[in-house]
Structure formats: C-alpha cells, structure tokens
Amino acid sequence: MRIRVERHVQFSNCAIKKKNDLSGSLKLDNLPDTLTEFTAHQNKFSGSVDLTQLPAAMLTLILEHNRLSGSVVLTQLPDSLCKLYLSNNQFSGALDLRRLPSSMFYLFLNNNSFSGTVDLSQLPQGIKGLDLSDNELSGEVFIPDDLFDSVGADNTKIIKRHME
C-alpha cells in the first residue's frame, strides 16, 4: 500500500494508526510545510528515511516499531523538533548527538543497531529523556545529576558517570 501526502494538503498532524501492517518505503522529504506531527508506528515500513528534509514546523516525529534501516542524520533536524522516536527499528551506523535542536526534549533511539562511541557533552539543555539502550554503543559519558536517571543505556557498553 502506498500513502502519498501531497504538498497542497493543509493539516497540522498526520497519524498512520498502529498495527495496520502497512509496508513499503516511507518518504518524508515532501511533507507539507505546516505539518507539526507525523506518526507511523507499529507497522512494517522498511528502508532508509531521510530526516534532513523534514518541515521546519515539525514538532513530533514517531516512527517506532517498524523495519526501518540504514544510517540516520540527526545533525540537520528542524530547530522546532521536540520529540523524536525511532525505537525498535533496524537503524545502524554511528550517532552524532552533538548538534541536536535546542528544542529537543525526548529522543528515543533504543532497540536498533547503532554502533560506535557516543558523545553526550552537547545535549540540549531542556532534554528530559534519552534512550540509547539495546544498541552497540560505547563510551564514557558524563551526565548532569538531574538528567542521569533519564538517560537509558541498558545493554550497551556506555559507562554513565555523574557530572561533577
């Protein structure tokens, strides 16, 4: 099944309801400029996704529980993006978390195949939740006390340390 979102459609959010078993690729590069929320979780979408062309108005993107794969560029997300959920897919490659939008407060990347050393030294100040669990990630990371328990790193080689 193919779902096509035309540019002339004016709406602020789009939800592809869960457990529809929708499949195929998910093209996000031509979404309406005014789209603020896009949800496509618990389906069977596959292939890579380009997050570098999301609408400037995008606040929330939920792509959890699919079969999406490939590397993910997180350094060119819209400045407005607050919530990004990519959990339970097959994404891989290194993660660059040094230039996330300053508005970001939830980032869930758990249960994928991301690998390499992570640097959490430049997380947005308002971040409230970050889950990196169940990936092939490593590194020693220093986390402020108020965020320490909100950073998930279970089943990784990440060593969490309290920032002094």
Which positions does each model-derived feature cover?
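A structural signal for leucine-rich repeat
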Residues: 4-9, 27-32, 50-56, 73-79, ...
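Conserved LRR concave beta-strand detector
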Residues: 11-14, 36-39, 59-62, 82-85, ...
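Acidic (E/D-rich), amphipathic helical modules within compact regulatory domains
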Residues: 26, 40-44, 49, 59-67, ...
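LRR N-terminal entry segment and analogous cap-like coil->beta motifs
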Residues: 1-40
